[in-house]
């Protein structure tokens, strides 16, 4: 499939947050590694879907920064990603506290947990407004360069 043929659809932010929160609760309640692994893979698929949509919007915006539709989409992502990161923190905590951590590390490597620990150290919900402002300033700078 060509990039130009890929369909962009803005996700419903509340549905995305609810899905991630639901997966987090399911991970916490998993009875065995196989169940936890299936939930993990579902979360990864959801994450890929969200990041693909964000990338489509970003690339299409960078092609023509005057395009009002994709300018609006870029603003949406600038505000949504920091909010999503707050919800993602709960997933990360659940992974770190999982009784199946050893099995996850054996299958996916210790880097999975090293990155998770770093993620928890580098984000706090209190900085969401600053992250959103940083994203907006970056977008304004990109427009100047274009």
Regions found by a protein language model. Give the residues of each.
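A well-structured
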Residues: 2-146
């Amino acid at each position: 499939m060509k990039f130009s043929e890929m369909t962009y659809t803005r996700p419903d932010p509340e549905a995305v947050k609810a899905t991630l929160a639901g997966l987090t609760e399911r991970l916490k309640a998993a009875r065995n590694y196989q169940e936890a692994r299936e939930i993990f893979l579902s979360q990864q698929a959801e994450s890929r879907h969200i990041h693909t949509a964000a990338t489509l919007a970003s690339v299409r915006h960078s092609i023509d920064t005057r395009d009002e539709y994709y300018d609006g989409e870029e603003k949406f992502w600038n505000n949504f990603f920091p909010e999503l990161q707050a919800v993602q923190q709960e997933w990360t905590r659940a992974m770190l506290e999982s009784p199946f951590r050893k099995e996850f590390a054996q299958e996916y490597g210790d880097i999975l947990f090293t990155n998770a620990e770093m993620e928890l150290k580098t984000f706090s919900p209190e900085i969401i407004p600053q992250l959103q402002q940083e994203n907006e300033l970056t977008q304004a700078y990109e427009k100047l360069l274009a």
